[in-house]
């Protein structure tokens, strides 16, 4: 079923690197073409994914986020093995990695399809626009100086509010258990296409989180004399200036995970994971 498989690992986690070697050896023994590389090598990964039919990650949610950005716009399914902490997106424990891979190779499992956002960063000056895919969240926030910034929000080209706050988060359903949740946002069912808008420590005005329909377009406009930053999925980070706009909408692209657990896995594990219990269900 799978003729070419890529293994993407967390390069700073020795256990993730060692497991990647064992998985590659298993695929070699089965005569399946495979390649391995670091999740931190986006350019190299992009050059290797041609004709790859399955991606296996060894790491945590951060490894998955980097992998997703590297393989897009290709919608290659991901089988994820948790060597991180909470692991909301991961599927297997390290102990079950080989057996789980064998099950997937035998045709078992189902596809868990996740919605993405796409963002266009529009500088206020003549600098070129930039485009991003977003799996978890986009954050416009203050810089290192502890001063609030103003972020004006338009929804579908209509003014909504101006946050005077530490910043604002626009999140997918997948990202709803991350920074948005920590800032007081709701948790969405992971396959939802809705979009979450959440202010970060607002000083005055609207302090609530808002769930927007999937067809919404959201503009965040920076208005500050102080340092401000844009963070995409927690690892693409850049300074932004007053007058810059981040325009976000739902993407037509998806990220697909291979699951071996029943389709109610999210609800069964949600409370445990949000309480900070990092133990995998496969370790119990």
Swiss-Prot record:
Query: Which residues are NAD(+)-binding?
Result: 61-62, 66, 136-137, 147, 164, 166, 201
Can you say where in the cell this protein is located? Cytoplasm
The superkingdom listed in its UniProt entry is Bacteria
Q: Which GO terms describe its molecular function?
A: ATP binding; metal ion binding; NAD binding; NAD+ kinase activity
- Which BP terms from GO are recorded? NAD metabolic process; NADP biosynthetic process
One cellular component term from this protein's GO annotations in UniProt: cytoplasm
Reaction equation(s) it catalyzes: NAD(+) + ATP = ADP + NADP(+) + H(+)
Q: Which cofactor does it need?
A: a divalent metal cation
Q: Which Gene3D superfamilies match?
A: Probable inorganic polyphosphate/atp-NAD kinase, domain 1, Probable inorganic polyphosphate/atp-NAD kinase, domain 2
| Keyword list, A-Z | ATP-binding, Cytoplasm, Kinase, NAD, NADP, Nucleotide-binding, Transferase
The primary site where this protein sits is cytoplasm
Q: Which residue spans adopt a coiled-coil conformation according to this UniProt entry? A: none
InterPro entries xref list: ATP-NAD_kinase_N, ATP-NAD_kinase_PpnK-typ_C, NAD/diacylglycerol_kinase_sf, NADK
Tell me which EC number(s) this protein carries.
2.7.1.23
Which positions are catalytic residues?
61
What's the family? Belongs to the NAD kinase family.
Q: What is this protein's function?
A: Involved in the regulation of the intracellular balance of NAD and NADP, and is a key enzyme in the biosynthesis of NADP. Catalyzes specifically the phosphorylation on 2'-hydroxyl of the adenosine moiety of NAD to yield NADP.
Write the protein's name. NAD kinase
Q: Which gene encodes it?
A: nadK
């Amino acid at each position: 079923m799978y003729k070419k498989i890529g293994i993407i690992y967390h390069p700073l986690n020795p256990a993730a690197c060692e497991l990647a070697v064992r998985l590659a050896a298993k695929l070699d023994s089965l005569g399946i073409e495979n390649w391995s590389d670091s999740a931190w090598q986006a350019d190299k990964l992009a050059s290797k994914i041609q004709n790859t039919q399955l991606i296996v990650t060894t790491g945590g949610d951060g490894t998955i986020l980097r992998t997703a950005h590297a393989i897009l716009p290709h919608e290659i399914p991901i089988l994820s093995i948790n060597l991180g902490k909470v692991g909301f997106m991961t599927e297997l424990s390290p102990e079950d990695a080989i057996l789980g891979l064998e099950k997937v190779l035998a045709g078992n499992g189902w596809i868990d399809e996740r919605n993405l956002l796409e963002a266009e960063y529009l500088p206020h000056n003549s600098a070129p626009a930039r485009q991003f895919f977003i799996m978890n969240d986009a954050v416009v926030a203050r810089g290192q100086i502890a001063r609030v910034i103003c972020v004006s929000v338009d929804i579908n080209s209509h003014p909504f509010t101006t946050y005077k706050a530490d910043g604002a988060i626009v999140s997918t359903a997948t990202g709803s258990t991350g920074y948005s949740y920590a800032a007081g946002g709701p948790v969405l069912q992971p396959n939802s296409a809705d979009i979450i808008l959440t202010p970060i420590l607002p000083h005055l005005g609207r302090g609530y989180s808002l769930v927007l329909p999937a067809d919404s377009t959201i503009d965040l406009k920076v208005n500050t004399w102080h340092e401000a930053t844009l963070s995409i999925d927690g690892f693409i980070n850049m300074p932004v200036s007053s007058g810059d706009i981040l325009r976000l909408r739902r993407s037509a692209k998806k990220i697909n995970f291979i699951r071996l657990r029943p389709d109610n896995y999210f609800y069964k594990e949600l409370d445990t994971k949000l309480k900070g219990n990092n133990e995998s269900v496969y370790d119990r």
